[in-house]
Structure formats: structure tokens, C-alpha cells
């Protein structure tokens, strides 16, 4: 499986505070581990298919990671809140 962090993901992470950036990084690492090894999610992590190949992962209620999962390719697209994810999906 191949993982790619899109420039839009990197740009979106810059808007967070340092402690939130660390939480986003930890969640992304957990997702990579879970998807590459076909492991179950740990408690406290939500994973939801949104539309088409777009999925959302979250740990807690505030911060979400939007990624596109197409076969063997996982592209991390955006980190943000619920409204950021909805706004992105409306335009893509």
C-alpha cells in the first residue's frame, strides 16, 4: 500500500497549534499503521466513509483527517474541523 501526503494536507496542518499538530501527526501514523497492516482501530478513533473514495478519521470531536482511499493508494488530503471537511467535499 502506498501513502501520499498532498500539499493541501500540509497547508491545512500549518493552521493548527503545536499540540494539535502533534495529535494530527499521531492520528495519521495510526491510520498508516492500521491500513498497511489491516489492523483494527483503537478505541477513541472514528473512521467513516463520506462519499466516493473519501474517508474521514477523527480522534475526539474537533479535529478530522480527510483522505482518499483508492485500492492500494491512500492520499491524505486535509486536516480540519467538520466544516472544513464539508467545504472541501462540496468543491471536489
Show which residues each predicted segment covers.
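A short, surface-exposed loop/turn module that caps and links secondary-structure elements
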Residues: 30-58
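Short, structured coil/loop segments at alpha-helix boundaries
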Residues: 17-25, 47, 51
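Hydrophobic alpha-helical segments and their boundary regions
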Residues: 15-17, 27, 41
Amino acid at each position: 500500500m502506498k501513502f501520499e501526503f498532498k500539499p493541501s494536507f500540509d497547508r491545512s496542518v500549518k493552521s493548527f497549534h503545536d499540540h494539535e499538530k502533534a495529535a494530527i501527526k499521531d492520528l495519521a501514523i495510526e491510520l498508516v499503521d492500521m491500513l498497511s497492516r489491516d489492523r483494527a482501530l483503537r478505541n477513541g478513533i472514528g473512521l467513516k466513509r463520506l462519499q466516493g473514495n473519501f474517508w474521514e478519521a477523527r480522534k475526539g470531536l474537533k479535529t478530522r483527517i480527510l483522505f482518499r482511499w483508492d485500492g492500494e493508494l491512500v492520499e491524505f488530503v486535509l486536516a480540519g474541523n467538520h466544516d472544513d471537511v464539508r467545504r472541501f467535499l462540496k468543491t471536489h
